Amino acid sequence: MPDYWIKIAEREDEDLRHHHYLIAAKDEREARKIALKFMERFIDDDENPEKIDDGYAFYNNAILVKLADVKETTKEQFKDFLLKTHTINLT
């Protein structure tokens, strides 16, 4: 089963945060479906998020969570990205 790199954009007021996840799925369509199901519970405190295009709105549109990108990848490529973005190199 291939791996898919899921990029989620979370917007609260003017703040934009990106979250990256790895999902194993049979194809891109299934990966999107799994990602959207995960995103529905992205903010635990909101029991009734509103479905919007490619995502959900929480707290009466105060926080928008959208599926920004889905692409096939490998665990190795995803791990390299995480190491690159979370490693401090002062040289």
What function would you assign to each model-found segment?
Residues 37-91:
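Short, mixed-charge low-complexity intrinsically disordered segments
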Residues 5, 20-22, 79, 88:
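Compositionally biased, intrinsically disordered low-complexity segments enriched
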Residues 1-19:
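Short aromatic-glycine-(Arg/Gly/Cys) micro-motifs in beta-strand/loop hairpins
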Residues 16-28:
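A short, exposed loop/beta-hairpin motif centered on an aromatic-Gly-Thr core
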Residues 8, 22-24, 58-63:
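Extended low-polarity, hydrophobic cluster-rich segments
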Residues 29-34:
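Short amphipathic alpha-helices within nucleic acid-binding modules
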